[in-house]
Amino acid sequence: MDTMKAVVFKGKDHIAVEEVPKPTPKAGEAVLRITTTTICGTDVHIVRGEYPVRPGLIIGHEPVGVIEELGAGLENLYHVGQRVIAGAITPCGQCFYCLNGVHSQCQGALGGWRFGNTINGAWAEYLLVPDARANLAPIPDGLQDEDVVLCPDIFSTGLSGAESGNIRVGDSVAVFAQGPIGLCATLGAKLRGASLIIGVDSNDQRLATARRYGANVVLNPNNVDVVAEIKRMTEGRGADVTIEALGRQETFENALRATRPGGTLSSLGVYSGKLVAPYEAIYAGLADQKIVTTLCPGGKERMRRLMAMISTGRVDLRPLVTHTFALDDIHEAFELFSQQRDGVLKVALYPDASRLNAMHAGAARGAKEPERMPL
């Protein structure tokens, strides 16, 4: 039996690099050789035991790779050696939710959020992709892994916060938390034409990045009363749309208080424990406010559209990948990411350490990055 290297969840606060069986595709499935993946905040929740997955599962849900093997029925759609990504959400395209356009809630046997949740994920040398016809998106020529590695989850999720909030041209928008998802939500607000974009975070370095990604005002809650400032800037009303991108009671409550009557709070955070909406924050339920939640849209067409924005220079996500590690060094990488050290935003993982070494060697020689259009 062929084996591969993978990071296996063993139980709360315990992951290990192990040799496990390499997957074999059935009809309609594909096996990818993973070239790049990342660590996500949801992975931290899983390892800490805050989100239930079974011990023995390979986690990770942001795959970039090369097609290693195709199951029957895919020969005319893809080819071995083709560079592709798959979304963190893998819709089947046939169930009630898929047919009604809510792909993230797919109820297909292997649809919805499955990678690193109910089926083996991307922290491995190889990944089995179900319903490959609906989920594998070819990477456009000229794009590197680092250009697109955030498309499967972070970019799609952040952008969906702006989409679900139904931001209109000229709206005022406040984005609470400027981590990778919040920064992509800030970018989404800019792309949708918001006139006032307020980035909120307690980390000044992240606020500086928020300005680059579209915020024209930034607020640090350690220095100002954020809700009062947002209301002051919006003639006392509050923002038309607020986006909560952290998943904590405090940020959810502040976002709610900063949302004007008739406005929308778009919630992107993954919450654990009880979430409370104080009655005065929702004007005793009389303010015509909307609270919407969303899980990152996936599927082949969503991935194609996200990569199109990158390939045309409309979007540059490379600055969000701040650290790189070999998959073998997952413990060091996970500790840095989970403890938010060294200005980390996103950590890229490389199952093939030689590829990472070659990248570092190129950087040491002063290899020039491709020129990008300004945001």
Where is each model-derived feature located?
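Mid-domain Rossmann-like dinucleotide-binding core that forms the NAD(H)/NADP(H) cofactor-binding site
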Residues: 81, 138-224, 228
